[in-house]
């Protein structure tokens, strides 16, 4: 494994190799009941303009008041990103005009953000791990929403989102492929969900990304970057990067130059298109907001929040590998979702019984996860309980049933007896494994007698043993103990 080493990810152009340089600005909606500078609700899906205070609507004389919970959530996130927490930060006005920005400016943080540099360790694949640097995290207000599809002649504005707290998490340009960018956003979302600082729901706009892409020849300075705004799914982030990189390579190989600009990704057409020329900081005329004092707190405040942080994904993965002996891949899959990790741990320790951790992991990440995906639910929200899966694993370990029969029992739990006890189901339906060697020998003898040609083939080619095992299992309804079947067949066939 290339731990903490970023391999070069080159793509082929018509005139040689190119390297993609990627940085992401992720906008994460802060989990809080009220907005950043007002007491209005942050409820999603409310009637248009029903969650709007006078501050959000920029009524004259209305002054912003900082929401302490949003500050705490930003600090928690910074701690989760192993980042520098700045004890003094400043809110600035970012000036621009848009119909859904009633103040005519956005309250953000420019020169003095609440969180400084940090790092995220990302598993790109089972054999590749990279570090992505965090440049900064700052708090800012979200804008409202312009609606252009309600009328043929008019546009409408919904200010429910106006003033909702966002954390803008700015990465360093450390990613070199779409796969790395996708893995980074997935890991970042997992960290935020563990911390409880953002729900990470991209469908509702709680997490969206501005994607900065440039290309260069290997070893050359960074090229001119273009920013793709408001990409709202991990899949689209990858597609936008690959599409934009190809566009830039085509221009450069034809002798053109890249214009620094803001672009939009159209997933339907599979292309990016120009939105506007890319603004520089001076275009926004940043200056400290005169209505807000600098935000200051002491180290004791930070330490108090740090002491109450939950176990985070990297620490949980390390513990699963150490305490349960799980391979890195299995541990990584389990901890990618906090509820799934909790479900696994409850299952493996159910009733104080020590179960085979790897076997439990195989069931949770295999058949149980497959069922959860088929019904569009997380593992923890299906009707399959840790108690049921623990009992199923116990029955396999006790050799009461085989793995194949266990799958049949799971199907019964899914389709017929949702609240059933696997042990009761096995008893009631006569699914116990046949361990009587006499009965198994009788089945083996019958199959050998009926297939003399196959016997000769198996003796010449031992891999044919699998055919005989299958026939015995079929004759016993899948109930024969597989280990006993193998041993008896080998003895009878002389292989």
From Swiss-Prot:
Domain of life: Bacteria
Similarity-based family: Belongs to the GatB/GatE family. GatB subfamily.
Short name of one Pfam family: GatB_Yqey
Enzyme class: ligase
Oligomeric form and interacting partners: Heterotrimer of A, B and C subunits.
PANTHER family listed in its UniProt record: GLUTAMYL-TRNA GLN AMIDOTRANSFERASE SUBUNIT B MITOCHONDRIAL AND PROKARYOTIC PET112-RELATED (PTHR11659), GLUTAMYL-TRNA(GLN) AMIDOTRANSFERASE SUBUNIT B, MITOCHONDRIAL (PTHR11659:SF0)
Entry EC number(s): 6.3.5.-
Organism lineage string: Bacteria, Pseudomonadati, Pseudomonadota, Alphaproteobacteria, Hyphomicrobiales
The protein, known as: Aspartyl/glutamyl-tRNA(Asn/Gln) amidotransferase subunit B
Catalytic activity annotation: L-glutamyl-tRNA(Gln) + L-glutamine + ATP + H2O = L-glutaminyl-tRNA(Gln) + L-glutamate + ADP + phosphate + H(+); L-aspartyl-tRNA(Asn) + L-glutamine + ATP + H2O = L-asparaginyl-tRNA(Asn) + L-glutamate + ADP + phosphate + 2 H(+)
Keyword hit for Transferase: no
Gene name linked to the record: gatB
Record's keyword annotation contains Protein biosynthesis: yes
Organism annotation: Beijerinckia indica subsp. indica (strain ATCC 9039 / DSM 1715 / NCIMB 8712)
Gene Ontology molecular function terms on file: asparaginyl-tRNA synthase (glutamine-hydrolyzing) activity; ATP binding; glutaminyl-tRNA synthase (glutamine-hydrolyzing) activity
InterPro entries to which the protein is assigned, alphabetical: Asn/Gln-tRNA_amidoTrfase_suB/E (IPR017959), Asn/Gln-tRNA_Trfase_suB/E_cat (IPR006075), Asn/Gln_amidotransferase (IPR018027), Asn/Gln_tRNA_amidoTrase-B-like (IPR003789), GatB (IPR004413), GatB_C_1 (IPR042114), GatB_Yqey_C_2 (IPR023168), Gln-tRNA_amidoTrfase_suB_CS (IPR017958)
């Amino acid at each position: 494994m290339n731990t903490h080493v970023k391999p070069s990810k080159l793509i082929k152009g018509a005139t040689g190799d190119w390297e993609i340089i990627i940085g992401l600005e992720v906008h994460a909606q802060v989990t809080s009941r009220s907005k950043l500078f007002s007491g209005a609700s942050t409820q999603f899906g409310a009637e248009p303009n029903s969650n709007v205070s006078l501050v959000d609507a920029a009524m004259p004389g209305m002054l912003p008041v900082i929401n302490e919970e949003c500050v705490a959530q930003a600090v928690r996130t910074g701690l989760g990103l192993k980042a520098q927490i700045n004890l003094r930060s400043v809110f600035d006005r970012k000036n621009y005009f848009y119909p859904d920005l009633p103040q005519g400016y956005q309250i953000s943080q420019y020169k003095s953000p609440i969180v400084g540099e940090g790092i995220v360790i990302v598993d790109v694949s089972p054999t590749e791990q990279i570090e992505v640097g965090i440049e900064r995290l700052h708090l800012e207000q979200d804008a409202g929403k312009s609606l252009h599809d309600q009328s043929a002649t008019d546009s409408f504005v919904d200010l429910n989102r106006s003033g909702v707290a966002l954390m803008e998490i700015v990465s360093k340009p450390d990613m070199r492929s779409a796969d790395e960018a996708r893995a980074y956003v997935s890991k970042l979302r997992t960290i935020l969900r563990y911390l409880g600082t953002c729900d990470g729901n991209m469908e509702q706009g709680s997490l969206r990304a501005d994607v900065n892409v440039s290309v260069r020849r290997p070893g050359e300075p960074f090229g001119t970057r273009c920013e793709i705004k408001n990409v709202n799914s991990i899949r689209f982030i990858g597609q936008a990067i690959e599409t934009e990189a190809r566009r830039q390579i085509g221009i450069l190989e034809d002798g053109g130059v890249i214009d620094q600009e803001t672009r939009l990704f159209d997933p339907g057409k599979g292309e990016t298109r120009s939105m506007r020329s890319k603004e520089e900081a001076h275009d926004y005329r940043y200056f400290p907001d005169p209505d807000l004092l600098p935000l200051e707190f002491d180290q004791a405040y930070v330490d108090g929040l740090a002491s109450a942080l939950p176990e985070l994904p990297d620490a949980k993965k390390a513990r699963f590998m150490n305490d349960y002996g799980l391979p890195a891949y299995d541990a990584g899959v389990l901890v990618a979702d906090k509820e799934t990790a909790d479900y696994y741990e409850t299952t493996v320790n159910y009733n104080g019984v020590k179960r085979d951790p790897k076997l439990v992991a195989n069931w949770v990440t295999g058949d149980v996860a497959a069922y959860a995906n088929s019904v569009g639910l997380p593992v923890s929200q299906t009707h399959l309980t840790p108690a049921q899966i623990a009992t199923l694993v116990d029955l396999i370990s006790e050799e009461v049933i085989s793995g194949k029969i266990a799958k049949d029992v799971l199907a019964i739990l899914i389709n017929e007896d949702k609240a059933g006890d696997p042990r009761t189901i096995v008893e009631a339906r006569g699914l116990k494994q046949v361990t009587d060697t006499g009965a198994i020998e009788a089945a083996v003898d019958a199959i050998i007698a009926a297939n003399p040609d196959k016997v000769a083939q198996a003796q010449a080619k031992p891999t044919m043993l699998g055919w005989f095992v299958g026939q015995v299992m079929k004759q016993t309804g899948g109930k024969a103990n597989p280990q006993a079947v193998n041993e008896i067949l080998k003895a009878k066939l002389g292989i």
